[in-house]
Amino acid sequence: MKPNIVLIMVDQMRGDCLGVNGNEFIETPNLDMMATEGYNFENAYTAVPSCIASRASILTGMSQKSHGRVGYEDGVSWNYENTIASEFSKAGYHTQCIGKMHVYPERNLCGFHNIMLHDGYLHFARNKEGKASTQIEQCDDYLKWFREKKGHNVDLIDIGLDCNSWVSRPWGYEENLHPTNWVVNESIDFLRRKDPSKPFFLKMSFVRPHSPLDPPKFYFDMYKDEDLPEPLMGDWANKEDEENRGKDINCVKGIINKKALKRAKAAYYGSITHIDHQIGRFLIALSEYGELNNTIFLFVSDHGDMMGDHNWFRKGIPYEGSSRVPFFIYDPGNLLKGKKGKVFDEVLELRDIMPTLLDFAHISIPDSVEGLSLKNLIEERNSTWRDYIHGEHSFGEDSNHYIVTKRDKFLWFSQRGEEQYFDLENDPKELTNLIDSEEYKERIDYLRKILIKELEGREEGYTDGNRLLKGHPVSTLKHIR
């Protein structure tokens, strides 16, 4: 039988928030084991660092220019012909998604045989004046289950935390009722009810560590008194907050109270460790069903979280905290016959997930897919690889584009004409902006020309073919509206 495939996806987890990736403060024993015994990719990025566009890349294997989502916009239909789930389904796999999809309409199967949905608190879905199909009671299976357990009056907002806020506190109910546990509950139940005559493709999609920052008390307490590192602060960062943006509990940039920021990081780390332990629980269950050694796992996040670095928060911007993600493959049965424990430095993007997993299952990759399969890299066959990724995000005054390679990164904020350049080999924390350095002028010109070429013909008018122009940012390109 073909291998089972499990795609484990978390939301808003930074690439540096794994012990195996050099973080000495966080405890991620199961994830560290999986990455250490598998194949770890240290230069994985999202081309559009927010939820919807990142998930479109994973779902379709396309670049953002092709799937059409270059910023954050709810309510735009998902009508892609070829998806990762549809290809597995057509190839005879039993397909299931549990947790976050963040598509529209919310109950769009997108090729899965079944979905058990929890997108978290979405302002768009909570619009009480909207269509019934977009109201959360109609499209959140976790909330239905939660109310069956605790009564019809309980809600996702009971502990008073917004879904984008830096405010944090422990989960207000029993640990086993947390959404993170629910994803694993339902994933284990899928092992019971799956078709035993077919291999399966399971997407386990956690809402955390995305806000609300509400891990169960045990996990919050693990970190709340620890001396966690201060946020990174580049020489280019705005050290002032004249407009008091940090007073906004949902701020994207600004300066917030140090105690509150320390609690936020404790809750963020706690949420990740909680996910780690629950993934450990799933591994135990999969072993009990006798399927562990016939299963290949891919672990990834949709994007990261600035968590106060350079006085920025959340995501949507090109800096490492927002754009770089954890990405590893775990193959306990050594079905891939590769050199396990290897760390790769090739530049990856989320569009590479679909062709990689289809390749693992010996399924044909549709012509619409623009990502690259990692199978040849893992098998150490001679293969060419991309030199860079073009990333972007429409974001009002902070709309941005970037070119990132394994050695450096060029950034352009289109609406204010600001450029930055970081030598990631020598400055992986992006502490020194070298845009005015004569030493790097030739390299910067080269990367700028790459960006101009990437943006040629785009409807926003970002270039005339010779230079970068301010343009008119949009969140969704016309061809998918």
From Swiss-Prot:
PANTHER family reported for this sequence: IDURONATE 2-SULFATASE
GO annotation, cellular component aspect: cytoplasm
Entries under InterPro entries matching the protein: Alkaline_phosphatase_core_sf, Sulfatase_CS, Sulfatase_N
Record's catalysed reaction(s): an aryl sulfate + H2O = a phenol + sulfate + H(+)
Residues annotated as binding Ca(2+): D11, Q12, C51, D302, H303
Matches recorded under NCBIfam families: PRK13759.1 (NF010322)
Family, similarity comment: Belongs to the sulfatase family.
SUPFAM superfamilies: Alkaline phosphatase-like (SSF53649)
UniProt-listed CDD domains: sulfatase_like
Segments crossing the lipid bilayer: none
Residue positions, PTM 3-oxoalanine (Cys): C51
Cofactor(s), names only, from the UniProt record: Ca(2+)
Entry's cofactor comment: Binds 1 Ca(2+) ion per subunit.
Modification after translation: The conversion to 3-oxoalanine (also known as C-formylglycine, FGly), of a serine or cysteine residue in prokaryotes and of a cysteine residue in eukaryotes, is critical for catalytic activity. This conversion can be carried out in vitro by AnSME under anaerobic conditions.
Enzyme Commission no: 3.1.6.1
Keywords assigned: Calcium, Hydrolase, Metal-binding, Oxidation
List of catalytic residues: C51 (nucleophile), H102
Protein name: Arylsulfatase
One Pfam family cited in the UniProt record for this chain: Sulfatase
Function: Has sulfatase activity toward para-nitrophenyl sulfate, which is increased in presence of calcium ion.
One of the record's GO molecular function terms: arylsulfatase activity
